[in-house]
A protein has these predicted regions:
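Conserved N-terminal phosphate-binding loop of PLP-dependent enzymes in the Aspartate aminotransferase
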Residues: 1-154
Length: 154
């Protein structure tokens, strides 16, 4: 169901006259009801807390690999939207090659990862917060294996 919102500073939002700011999706009571139901689920199922819990598990697993995989130079992100950044072990420069190697090894093992960042040396994570714990555990195992395998060969 269609739903849209526009936000901005008061002086801008108050500038248009009556009827001057609107759109196709304005006034859809079914869309608003659906959005309210989604907000209820987020609260009732504590999905914000779950996002923090999953994000912490991911960050802890990545942190535990730093000693064996010195290419890991940064682990960051709020909640369950995280990223790990890799540099070359020798030059200490951003390493898109290493990030891509991790991605390809993980893909061979059944885990799809996305590289990104200005230098292409970052892998970001944005999985659904409703992921089953067993599936998430399997993903963490594959990720760890891929990073360690890439590090051993680099």
């Amino acid at each position: 169901f269609p739903l849209a919102a526009v936000t901005g500073r008061a002086e801008i939002m108050d500038a248009p006259g009556p009827g001057g700011l609107g759109g196709t999706y304005g006034g859809s009571p079914i869309g608003v009801a659906a959005a309210n139901a989604v907000l209820d689920v987020i609260e009732d199922e504590n999905l914000c807390g779950r996002a923090n819990q999953l994000g912490n598990r991911l960050k802890q697993r990545l942190e535990s690999l730093r000693e064996k995989a010195p290419q890991i130079v940064d682990i960051r992100g709020p909640g369950f939207m995280n990223a790990v950044e890799f540099n070359d072990r020798t030059t200490k420069l951003p390493s898109a090659e290493f990030a891509n190697k991790v991605r390809l090894i993980a893909l061979d093992k059944g885990l799809i990862l996305l590289t990104c960042g200005v230098h292409g040396n970052v892998i970001r994570f944005l999985a659904p917060i409703t992921i089953q714990d067993s599936v998430f555990g399997e993903a963490l195992d594959i990720l760890e294996s891929a990073i360690l395998e890439a590090s051993a060969g680099n």
